Amino acid sequence: MRLAVLAGVLAVVAAVVFFRSRVAEHRTYDDVPGRLKELRDNSDPTAFFGFHTRDVDALYFVYENGALFLDYELYNSPKEGYAAPFRKTAAAHGFSVTTTSYDQVHTVLRIQLSSVESEAAEQAYGIAHDLFGINRATKLEFLPQCT
């Protein structure tokens, strides 16, 4: 009996931990530098995190080969219309945009940010603010860090 109760409790705790790790959190942009540090410290080369900018749009932070990147995926035809504004905003902030893909199907627009978390967060904030109207008080839906 005790073993069954213990097993049940452990199963519930494991389920809560699992689902909580997959649920988006609502925070402000001030949490980005800490998240960037966690991302850099993560040993999984496929780890990333992002936040919704509006409805289903999202910006993603990626740490690859010692560099931090800000990515914007053009995953459907309507999103392709945002490529030019993204490039223009990036250029206004002194960045060039490269293209890559996560799945060899959809284009991802990529900006290389500073390797210093606080600077990278500020650089990305400028882009997010100008392109999507985000400000420091905006509650953002952070996408779970994927590993």
Predicted regions and their residues:
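Hydrophobic membrane-insertion alpha-helices, especially the h-region
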Residues: 4-18
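Structured alpha/beta or helical-core interaction and ligand-binding surfaces enriched in interleaved
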Residues: 17-147
